[in-house]
Design a protein with these regions (language model features):
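Feature captures hydrophobic
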Residues: 1-126
């Protein structure tokens, strides 16, 4: 990802449209990204697999709260949410099952990043 990893992540997520892994899910997840005294909010709406993202504060079935810096590292594929949760750097409120769904979406980006890195490595070896 280039530029702001957080914005790029949510724009990419919103542009995916339909995710077959989430075809049975209808829920909302709000990300509260904290930076100093400022909280940036992103709302992910999943409607039977259809994904949409908005940059607003609204009630949600689950809220994931973490620092913006940490989410930048997650969005760029440098780290994942689970270790950060175990360290107490991520707070989850609401439906914990949705966390598993979100991890799938984040893992998809991490997998793409690893494939891109592997492809770049393979090209350099030729």
């Amino acid at each position: 990802m280039t530029g702001d990893a957080v914005t790029a992540f949510f724009e990419d997520l919103g542009s995916r449209g339909y995710d077959p892994l989430l075809r049975s899910v209808s829920a909302t997840v709000r990300f509260d990204l904290v930076s100093g005294k400022t909280t940036e909010r992103w709302l992910l709406t999943i409607q039977k697999g259809d994904l949409s993202v908005s940059h607003r504060n609204a009630r949600a079935d689950a809220v994931i709260r973490l620092s913006r810096d940490l989410f930048e590292r997650v969005a760029s594929g440098e780290t994942t949410l689970l270790p950060a949760m175990l360290r107490g750097e991520v707070v989850l409120e609401g439906d914990y099952k949705l966390m598993i769904m979100i991890r799938r979406l984040l893992r998809t980006r991490l997998t793409v990043r690893r494939r891109e890195a592997a492809a770049g490595y393979a090209r350099r070896q030729q």
